[in-house]
Structure formats: structure tokens, C-alpha cells
């Protein structure tokens, strides 16, 4: 749980970190701030440096402390409250870096899950293995239901305390220390980074540049990709994206061309297509802002289909959106899940209904994984964050108001043109 006393314009609000976080509302209220804040908690569990800095700040040097370890005992004790306070401060530093804004003001309070003890004890045990006179001495560390064996004399850049702490947190929060392998960010205006030499000024685009560098150079893992997701991406792209000699290429039935010559929509979606082909998306966390960017309304709905496949695959996601088309479709897919549950004893009936609706029955989205938050402006100009009842769907009140205003103004203009009155 994160309590926000202040974060930019956001004040006196609370959010609970969930597998999928969806933020909507008018522009300028802080959706990106919240998405980055939520992504931070996945990023820090994968980053080998940040928690290591916390361990170093406490003066816990494993190499020095090792000399005093005998048989078994307690190595260190981490105060949960102290670590939560450190997380709150480090999160603000992270956001300042991501936004290139050292003046960003923030005050947070963070609470880790209740099943993590208030005092996190790290125990050690000496272990001697091997033949007589050729023994190898190891230290085994125990913390948060995990064990880590370190051979005497081994040197790692990350403290064994930090390494075990990170993976213990993953185990306790996500259910298995193997459930998070990497994190990726996809900011707004993603396309130009694929084709242009851009020097990022913000941490957000610096991380995105590293994201596309990484996924552009790893080998494909087709065995981890569902055919359903592959077909959806091919349909929305109307082709296929690949890399060759460090260049991004777009191929269709009419031939192959540099991605720089493809439509803006293709360049925006291309990194997602590569991510799907080259990572195990069930074990990654992904921040994606404005997935609907540069897409026709029909393709905005298709993007909701694609992200529903990510959700069902187990991807941890933080999403911001301005699109009522995207949200409407997501609501449809959540209702489709409810329909599938109604006919859980009669799957043939469910499939028949889907066929009549001309919708893929596999697209129903696991709505219980989603937490949706609506950002709105208070009378004093600050931003309020309100959790939505996902059982009723994701609301799009701000979009409805814009549509009503547009219809009303359009009607009055036409009326004035017709008879000179309003």
C-alpha cells in the first residue's frame, strides 16, 4: 500500500499495488507519475544496485562481517519500518530521475505486505564440503524463506544480503522468486527512438532506449508466445516487425522496408511485438503509457485485445490511457470473462455466444488482476485519486463529458446555420 501525502499535484490519496494498474482521467493530473511510481516497485526488485545501496547505507559489508561468522547465528536484522521509509525516499529520487525534475516534491508512506515480519532476520550457517584437506567453505544465508549459498573468496558486485533480500521480497510479494525476470518501459512517442539517434534527457527515455536495445538483440523465444497474441499483433501491424544487422524492418505480403518508412502506428507498436517474440512475458513488468497513441479507433480496440493477452499471460503492467475506445473494449472483455464464468459448466454455449458476437472467446480478460484508478481535479486544483469498482467496469466519465460537449456545440452551430437561432 502506498499513501500519497503529495506527489506533484496529487495529494492525500492511496493506491494498492496490483498485478495490473490502470490510470485514466484528464491530462495534467499525474497519471504518468502514478504509473512510474507503481512500476518502481517492480524495477527495484530487479535492479541489482538500488537495494544494494540500502544495505551499504546500513554499513552491512558481507566480506568484512564474514570473518566473524562462526557455526550458526544472526548476520543482520532489517527493520521493516526502516526499509519502508527508505523506499519512500528512494521512490521520490527515482521519479525525479525518470522525469529529469529534481524539483519534484513528494511525500509518501509505504507499507509492505502484512505477512512480512517487522524484523527481517538474516541468519547464517557455515558449511564445509569436499574431501579432507581439500575442503570448500561456504556460508549459507537464510531470509524470507529462501537460502543462498556463498563460497568463501567469491566476489560479487551485489552484496549477498541485497541479492537474497531482493529475491525474498519477490517470493513473498509475487509468490515465487522466479516470477520476475525483467522490467521494461514504453513511454509516449515511442516510435522515433527506433529510427533516430536521440540522446535522452529523462530517465524514462533512457530506460526505454535500453529496453529497445535489449529486446532488439536477444534471440526470439517462439515457444513462449501464444498463437492468439501473435495473430493479434500481425493483424494490428498488418505485417511483421523484425531486426537485421541492428536495423528494424517491417515486412508485409508486398515486401520489406525500413521501419522508418512504415506508418507511425507501426513504429509505436513494433517494440511490443518484439517484446512478445523475445521475452517470456509472463515474467516481466511493463510500464506502457498511452497504448492507443497514433492508432485509428478500430486499432485502439485491437490494442485492448492485445493487452488483455498480456494480462492473461501474467504480465505485470502499469497503463495510462486517454482513450474511451480502449477502455470500452477493455470493459467488454471483462464482461466477457463474467459471461464465461456464467457458462463454466456449458463451454459450448459460451463459445456459441462468442461466435454470434464475432469475438474470440479466448480474449476474456482476468479482471480480478486489474486495479483501476480515476484521477480528478479538486476545487483547490490538487488531484484526487479514486479507486474504481472494477466489477462495474472502468469508468470514462471525462470522455463522456467531452462527447456530450462536442455533440451539444455541433448541434447548436448547425441550428444557427439553418435558422439563425440557438
Mark where each language-model region is.
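Extended hydrophobic secondary-structure segments that form protein cores and membrane-embedded regions
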Residues: 185-186, 364-376
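Conserved H-loop
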Residues: 316-325
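Conserved ABC ATPase signature
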Residues: 25-28, 32-33, 242-301
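ABC-family P-loop ATPase nucleotide-binding domains
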Residues: 205-208, 212-246, 251
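Walker A/P-loop NTP-binding motif
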Residues: 38-45, 275-278, 306-309
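P-loop NTPase switch/coupling surface
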Residues: 1-199, 328, 334-363, 383-389, ...
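Helical segment within the ABC ATPase nucleotide-binding domain
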Residues: 300-312
Amino acid at each position: 500500500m502506498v499513501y500519497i501525502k503529495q506527489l506533484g499535484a496529487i495529494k492525500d490519496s492511496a493506491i494498492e499495488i496490483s498485478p495490473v494498474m490502470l490510470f485514466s482521467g484528464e491530462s495534467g493530473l499525474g497519471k504518468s507519475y502514478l504509473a512510474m511510481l507503481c512500476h518502481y516497485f517492480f524495477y527495484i526488485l530487479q535492479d541489482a544496485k538500488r537495494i544494494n545501496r540500502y544495505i551499504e547505507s546500513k554499513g552491512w559489508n558481507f566480506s568484512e562481517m564474514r570473518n566473524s561468522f562462526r557455526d550458526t547465528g544472526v548476520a543482520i536484522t532489517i527493520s521493516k519500518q526502516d526499509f519502508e521509509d527508505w523506499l519512500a525516499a528512494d521512490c521520490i529520487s527515482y521519479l525525479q530521475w525518470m522525469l529529469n525534475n529534481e524539483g519534484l516534491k513528494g511525500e509518501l508512506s509505504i507499507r509492505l505486505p502484512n505477512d512480512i515480519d517487522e524484523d527481517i532476520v538474516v541468519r547464517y550457517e557455515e558449511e564445509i564440503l569436499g574431501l579432507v584437506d581439500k575442503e570448500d567453505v561456504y556460508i549459507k544465508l537464510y531470509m524470507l524463506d529462501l537460502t543462498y549459498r556463498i563460497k568463501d573468496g567469491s566476489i560479487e558486485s551485489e552484496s549477498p544480503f541485497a541479492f537474497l533480500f531482493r529475491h525474498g521480497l519477490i517470493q513473498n510479494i509475487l509468490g515465487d522468486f522466479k516470477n520476475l525476470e525483467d522490467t521494461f518501459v514504453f513511454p509516449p512517442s515511442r516510435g522515433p527512438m527506433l529510427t533516430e539517434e536521440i540522446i535522452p534527457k529523462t530517465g524514462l527515455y533512457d530506460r526505454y532506449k535500453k529496453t529497445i536495445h535489449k529486446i532488439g538483440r536477444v534471440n526470439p523465444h517462439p515457444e513462449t508466445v501464444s498463437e492468439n497474441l501473435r495473430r493479434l499483433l500481425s493483424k494490428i501491424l498488418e505485417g511483421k516487425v523484425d531486426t537485421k544487422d541492428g536495423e528494424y524492418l517491417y515486412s508485409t505480403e508486398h515486401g520489406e522496408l525500413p521501419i522508418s518508412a512504415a506508418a507511425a502506428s507501426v513504429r509505436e507498436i513494433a517494440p511490443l511485438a518484439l517484446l512478445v517474440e523475445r521475452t517470456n512475458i509472463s515474467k516481466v513488468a511493463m510500464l506502457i503509457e498511452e497504448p492507443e497513441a497514433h492508432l485509428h479507433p478500430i486499432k485502439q480496440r485491437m490494442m485492448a485485445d492485445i493487452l488483455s493477452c498480456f494480462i492473461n499471460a501474467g504480465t505485470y503492467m502499469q497503463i495510462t490511457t486517454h482513450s474511451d475506445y480502449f477502455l470500452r473494449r477493455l470493459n467488454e472483455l471483462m464482461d466477457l470473462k463474467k459471461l464465461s464464468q456464467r457458462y463454466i459448466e456449458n463451454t459450448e454455449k459460451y463459445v456459441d455466444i462468442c461466435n454470434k458476437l464475432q469475438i474470440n472467446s479466448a480474449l476474456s480478460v482476468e479482471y480480478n488482476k486489474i486495479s483501476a484508478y480515476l484521477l480528478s481535479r479538486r476545487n483547490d486544483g490538487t488531484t484526487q485519486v479514486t479507486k474504481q469498482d472494477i466489477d462495474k467496469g472502468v469508468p470514462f466519465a471525462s470522455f463522456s463529458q467531452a462527447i456530450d460537449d462536442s455533440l451539444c456545440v455541433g448541434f447548436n452551430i448547425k441550428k444557427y446555420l439553418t435558422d439563425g437561432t440557438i
